[in-house]
UniProtKB/Swiss-Prot annotation:
Annotated binding of Mg(2+) 1, by residue: D23
PANTHER family to which the protein is assigned, alphabetical: DNA POLYMERASE III SUBUNIT EPSILON, RIBONUCLEASE T
Name this protein carries in UniProt: Ribonuclease T
Family: Belongs to the RNase T family.
Organism this protein belongs to: Escherichia coli (strain K12)
Gene name linked to the record: rnt
Length: 215
């Protein structure tokens, strides 16, 4: 059997990338002008047999940056009151500094080289996180500047569904629509969905690659 067929480590599975599941809730669609209000992150790990699973969860309510737009339609959609003192919101710097610190530790521990965002319709979440990191002057951003794993695309391929709730249900997972549009809940569901898609491909024999497929 080839050496490649024995690879079960996280660093081997994604070409040295360390996948981190992210979801954000915002006050609009423009990452440069609209507020980031909530962010959750879940790191992933692999067991000794190469099965992917969620690992560490981080979750923060975020204070709107100075001068941020707060679109009423977006707030009505996600139900967030940015002025609610019970949110326990922190600055963009505090939230991302803690997430990046945990992610960098995970990269080192797993032998990976760089983090890659996993998200549902990932361009949206990626743009908001990157804009917030720039505003916060966080220089050591561990995430790839543009590459992502988009579970909307992956679920469309693997399950024939692109909506998060429908993809989860098709995969045999629970999805509580009353908890949707919470960054924490959506991140948890996205993490389990991504793991299921990756593990399903393994169960079907798609990974590890056969000797004939090795480059």
């Amino acid at each position: 059997m080839s050496d490649n067929a024995q690879l079960t480590g996280l660093c081997d599975r994604f070409r040295g990338f360390y996948p981190v599941v992210i979801d954000v809730e915002t006050a609009g669609f423009n990452a440069k002008t609209d507020a980031l209000l909530e962010i959750a992150a879940i790191t992933l790990k692999m067991d000794e047999q190469g099965w992917l699973m969620p690992d560490t969860t981080l979750h923060f309510h975020v204070e709107p940056f100075v001068g941020a737009n707060l679109q009423p339609e977006a707030l009505a959609f996600n139900g967030i009151d940015p002025n609610d003192p019970d949110r326990g919101a922190v600055s963009e710097y505090e939230a991302l500094h803690e997430i990046f610190k945990v992610v960098r530790k995970g990269i080192k521990a797993s032998g990976c080289n760089r983090a890659i965002m996993v998200a549902h319709n990932a361009n949206f979440d990626h743009s908001f996180m990157m804009a917030a990191a720039e505003r916060a002057s966080l220089k050591r951003n561990p995430f790839h500047p543009f590459a992502t794993f988009d579970t909307a695309a992956l679920a469309g391929l693997a399950l024939g569904q692109t909506v998060l709730s429908k993809a989860c249900q098709t995969a045999g997972m629970d999805f509580d629509s009353t908890q949707a549009h919470s960054a924490l809940y959506d991140t948890e569901r996205t993490a389990v969905l991504f793991c299921e898609i990756v593990n399903r491909w393994k169960r079907l024999g798609g990974w590890p690659l056969s000797a004939a497929e090795e480059v």
